[in-house]
Amino acid sequence: MSSLLLFNDKSRALQADIVAVQSQVVYGSVGNSIAVPAIKQNGLNVFAVPTVLLSNTPHYDTFYGGAIPDEWFSGYLRALQERDALRQLRAVTTGYMGTASQIKILAEWLTALRKDHSDLLIMVDPVIGDIDSGIYVKPDLPEAYRQYLLPLAQGITPNIFELEILTGKNCRDLDSAIAAAKSLLSDTLKWVVITSASGNEENQEMQVVVVSADSVNVISHSRVKTDLKGTGDLFCAQLISGLLKGEALTDAVHRAGLRVLEVMRYTQQHESDELILPPLAEA
């Protein structure tokens, strides 16, 4: 078969259920390096678009790499359309973004994409920082999230610190966190999943809060003491997979949390510093 046929017949193009836009590492299990295999375990097709490419996370004594240049990043997105690979696209997820300009480029691409995919689910994990570390992204990223990505998202998955940054409100107790989340809801943004709400430290519990216009659901999970990285990326991968498989939002959040706990325990049993995905049948 000639290469002309192989590479010019768009009817033969691979198709994606999900485009996942976030960080990638050569060594380790964060960003798309954990999200892609997790999504594939759920029987879904995913294309990974990197925002940064690093040798490993900065928690090691050496690391190399950095943000993907804007020209490359916009080209990665454009190429998916040029290859006609998005006919069956159902969702786009975002995680760690390297620069504010990437967020603007992504928002423009999503806006154009929506013209042909009116039912597209856009889920944004607004990676900004956490209570322990503060802001660990470039200082212009929070405003870029507010200006460009939040108006396009159907759902977002901030932690408490990120919710505070996005809303400018104190969220250190459950009621204030719920109120802050509700302040973000709009005709487009239908739900907020707060991934680190106030839990019961004495009972070793953590809480995930699912907030929509007409309901609030608090989901409690066991707390696993660990410094493992990438658990939030894994959670979002499991969440979007559950939603695309037809699970209700609260059920998908609950199942995603349970899967993350299973993976963390499995990783600890294997004495690894990086997340290891067990087969779903063993989880």
From Swiss-Prot:
NCBIfam families, alphabetized: PRK08176.1, pyridox_kin
E.C. number: 2.7.1.35
InterPro entries reported in the protein's UniProt record: PdxK, PM/HMP-P_kinase-1, PyrdxlKinase, Ribokinase-like
Gene Ontology MF term list: ATP binding; hydroxymethylpyrimidine kinase activity; magnesium ion binding; pyridoxal kinase activity; zinc ion binding
Enzyme type, top EC level: transferase
Any one annotated GO CC term: cytosol
Binding positions for substrate per the UniProt entry: S23, H59, D233
Name of the protein in question: Pyridoxine/pyridoxal/pyridoxamine kinase
Gene3D superfamilies tied to this protein: 3.40.1190.20
Taxonomic source organism: Escherichia coli (strain SMS-3-5 / SECEC)
Lineage, uppermost ranks: Bacteria, Pseudomonadati, Pseudomonadota, Gammaproteobacteria, Enterobacterales
GO terms, biological process: pyridoxal 5'-phosphate salvage
Cofactor: Mg(2+)
Residues at which ATP binds: D125, T157, E162, T195, H221, S222, R223, V224, T231
Alphabetical UniProt keywords: ATP-binding, Kinase, Magnesium, Metal-binding, Nucleotide-binding, Transferase, Zinc
Assembly and binders: Homodimer.
Reaction it catalyzes: pyridoxal + ATP = pyridoxal 5'-phosphate + ADP + H(+); pyridoxine + ATP = pyridoxine 5'-phosphate + ADP + H(+); pyridoxamine + ATP = pyridoxamine 5'-phosphate + ADP + H(+)
Keyword Nucleotide-binding (UniProt): yes
Annotated positions binding Mg(2+): Y136, E162
Family: Belongs to the pyridoxine kinase family. PdxK subfamily.
Free-text function comment from the UniProt entry: B6-vitamer kinase involved in the salvage pathway of pyridoxal 5'-phosphate (PLP). Catalyzes the phosphorylation of pyridoxine (PN), pyridoxal (PL), and pyridoxamine (PM), forming their respective 5'-phosphorylated esters, i.e. PNP, PLP and PMP.
